[in-house]
A protein has these predicted regions:
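Solvent-exposed, extramembrane regions of membrane proteins
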Residues: 1-13, 17, 78, 82, ...
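Membrane-proximal N-terminal segments immediately preceding the first transmembrane helix
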Residues: 2-24, 312-323
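Beta-strand elements of modular eukaryotic interaction domains
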Residues: 12, 242-245, 306-307
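Alpha-helical transmembrane segments
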Residues: 16-59, 325-359
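Beta-strand-rich binding-surface signature
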Residues: 21, 32, 252, 269, ...
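Eukaryotic intrinsically disordered and solvent-exposed regulatory patches
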Residues: 31, 239-241, 301-304
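Long, solvent-exposed, non-transmembrane segments immediately flanking or lying between transmembrane helices
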Residues: 38, 42-273
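Membrane-proximal extracellular juxtamembrane segment immediately upstream
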Residues: 267-383
Length: 383
């Protein structure tokens, strides 16, 4: 028993096993083998290394976005002239990555709390029995008092009076001048894995350049100042259409960087996408077209609280940062090479199947490839 254990350990540590190889001179099998190996080699070089960059590690960025609108708008509604600046038409005003630029509005001035009739169509009535006191209607403006107003044939409500009438949207939009507003975007990204920080104000963009440039896909692709009309156009929308009822546009800042080269070549690319807003062009959600919201400015007059209500139609802009940085790394490189070497074994498996099961001389090849032993014969010899 001791000698058997010793022999087993000796065989394990001091012997090397290698598979038996048979050289088959067959043109068909040889061509199939080389074609498969060539295909695997093309896959490793073309797909894994060139297209998928299998020799590099990757990282996504931590980013921040700051935005600033500039421009002045002018309206003249029923003889009332007004100038609109940034504080009036941008919501919210903090310079976030998502904001709304007002392009059209419906204004209801001098509202105060009281009893007044609903709009026709909101809750029609023929008698007080049709107006249940203390109840609400989802599309109404307030709480019903239980009275039917004979002059309008609608229920009386406790609400901010006079109630808003938003059935007629101004056309053309009141703030068509918004087409000339400009948007300044400041974006900073950091790739933690590679300890690289970049800004869209890349080399060559200084105060003098910013004061004169305007983004153009061909002539000034790195300028961080955009004309609102150009943004709408590049997103595939018509400005007058989207300005009337509002809509949404996505500005994508794409940081795709190969850090094997100098970091100064890591620069942003801007893409513009129309999300919704033009019913005749892209928007399929016909039940709720455009983008709008309401806000009120409250004030006191003769010790009575009043408000001016604005239904705002605007262009919502969402600035989205997408990023991917790559850099050479020995670990994924060795992993990709090892996987490729393993895939080469497919050629051997396929060729063995052809040799052993498809060719006319398959029995001959089986005898050459496999060595058969007879256990009973070995037992007799040992005895």
């Amino acid at each position: 028993m001791k000698s058997q254990i010793t022999n087993a350990l000796s065989d394990f540590f001091f012997e090397y096993e290698t598979p038996r190889q048979v050289l088959v001179r067959n043109r068909r099998v040889g061509v199939v083998c080389r074609l498969i190996q060539l295909g695997v080699l093309a896959y490793i070089i073309g797909w894994v290394f060139i297209y998928e960059k299998g020799y590099q590690s990757s990282d996504t960025a931590v980013s921040s976005v700051f935005s600033k609108m500039k421009g002045v708008g002018y309206t003249n509604v029923t003889g009332t002239e007004r100038i609109w600046d940034v504080a009036d038409y941008v919501f919210p005003p903090q310079g976030d990555s998502s904001f709304v630029v007002m392009t059209n509005y419906i204004i209801t001035e001098g509202q105060k709390m009281g009893n007044c009739p609903e709009l026709p169509g909101k809750h029609n009535c023929s008698s007080d029995a049709d107006c249940e006191g203390g109840s609400f209607k989802r599309t109404g403006h307030g709480q019903m008092t239980g009275k039917c107003v004979n002059t309008t044939k609608t229920c009386e409500v406790l609400a901010w009076c006079p109630v808003e009438d938003d059935n007629n949207i101004p056309d053309p939009p009141l703030l068509m001048s918004a087409e000339n507003y400009t948007l300044f975007i400041k974006n900073s990204v950091t790739f933690p894995l590679f300890e690289v920080t970049r800004s869209n104000l890349v080399e060559g963009i200084d105060n003098n350049y910013i004061s004169k440039c305007l983004y153009d896909q061909e002539d000034s692709p790195l300028c961080p100042i955009f004309k609102l009309g150009d943004i709408v156009k590049m997103s595939g929308f018509n400005f007058e259409t989207i300005a009337k009822v509002g809509g949404a546009i996505g500005i994508v800042i794409d940081w795709t960087c190969n850090l094997d080269f100098n970091v100064k070549h890591c620069k942003p690319m801007y893409n513009f996408h129309g999300l919704y807003g033009n019913p005749d062009e892209k928007d399929k959600a016909r039940a709720s077209v455009g983008y709008n919201f309401r806000f009120a400015k409250h004030y006191m007059e003769d010790k009575v609280q009043q408000r001016t209500l604005l239904k705002v139609f605007g262009i919502r802009i969402d600035i989205i940062v997408q990023s991917l940085a790559r850099k050479f790394d020995i670990i994924p490189t060795l992993t990709a090479i090892g996987s490729g070497v393993g895939i080469f074994g497919v050629a051997t498996v396929v060729c063995d199947l052809v040799l052993l099961y498809l060719l006319p001389k398959r029995e001959f090849y089986k005898n050459m490839k496999f060595k058969y032993t007879d256990t009973q014969t070995q037992v007799k010899h040992s005895l």
